[in-house]
Amino acid sequence: MSADKLPKALQATEDDIQLLLAAQCHLGTKNCDKSMENYVWKRRADGIHVINVGKTWEKLVLAARVLATIENPNDVCVISARPYGHRAVLKYGSFTGAQAIAGRFTPGSFTNYITRSFKEPRVIIVTDPRVDHQAIREAAYVNIPVIAFCDTDASTKFVDIAIPANNKSRHSIGLMWYLLCREVLRLRGTVPRGPTGPSGWDVLPDLFFYRDPEEIEREAAEKAAAAAAQEGADAEAAATSAAAGVTAEYDAGNAADAVLAAQPTETALDWSDEPVAGDWAAEPAADAQGGW
């Protein structure tokens, strides 16, 4: 079934195609496996094979319809040994309820029931058949269907549903997992169909993109430095205001002293002056009443 023959509700919108092109999901590699020739649109002058995005969307919807029929979401196992897909599979698992294996796949997880990591999923989804070959081989041993994002140089051996897309770019991997998760939720009826936003799914593709741990640490350090600088500025402002208050009090005290000094005071006695000496030889003045 081609993309133009899909039901109208399942057809790709202009925004979806723009997202696929912006994330370079249509750019393959210079090598092309024989099993992937049907998904190649043309070959550029520099040798890069261009993938037909119409067939990419067709296989994406087919995989979503298969996953939506599984009653227990925990029976789906998503795997990514490629670092660019670690965050994407974890987000897919958190939104859909699937089991996520991010990082190294433990050999025997599907075949050796003695191991603690033993699982019996009904279907698995892998990011790259070349990197996740161990999981695909073990799934083939126990008859577990495999859905894989396949680049032009990937082999489709033991792969039941191959979704042609660029599986080497961080943006391409994150966007493909985002679109697959969104279609599964739409087919389940969890998310209404509509544009991304309040009327539809309010999750953006950026949440599925890979983030460099050093970049995260750098952002955390910048935030901590900004917070420390803000605290220092606040402390300096508080110290400046306190110093201004002390200066104002000191100026007020000096002004009071100046006012008191300007007020008139009583003449003080000069204890250094000698008293005027009297004449002890002079006779006392006669009494006005007369003598005896």
From Swiss-Prot:
Its main location: cytoplasm. Keywords: Cytoplasm, Ribonucleoprotein, Ribosomal protein. PROSITE patterns: RIBOSOMAL_S2_2. Residues 265-292 are annotated as: Disordered. One of its GO terms (molecular function) is structural constituent of ribosome. Residues 277-292 have a biased composition (Low complexity). One of its GO terms (biological process) is ribosomal small subunit assembly. Gene3D superfamilies: Glucose-6-phosphate isomerase like protein, domain 1 (3.40.50.10490). It is found in: Cytoplasm. GO terms for cellular component: cytosolic small ribosomal subunit. Component of the small ribosomal subunit. Mature ribosomes consist of a small (40S) and a large (60S) subunit. The 40S subunit contains about 33 different proteins and 1 molecule of RNA (18S). The 60S subunit contains about 49 different proteins and 3 molecules of RNA (25S, 5.8S and 5S). Interacts with RPS21. Belongs to the universal ribosomal protein uS2 family. Required for the assembly and/or stability of the 40S ribosomal subunit. Required for the processing of the 20S rRNA-precursor to mature 18S rRNA in a late step of the maturation of 40S ribosomal subunits. This is Small ribosomal subunit protein uS2. It comes from Cryptococcus neoformans var. neoformans serotype D (strain JEC21 / ATCC MYA-565).
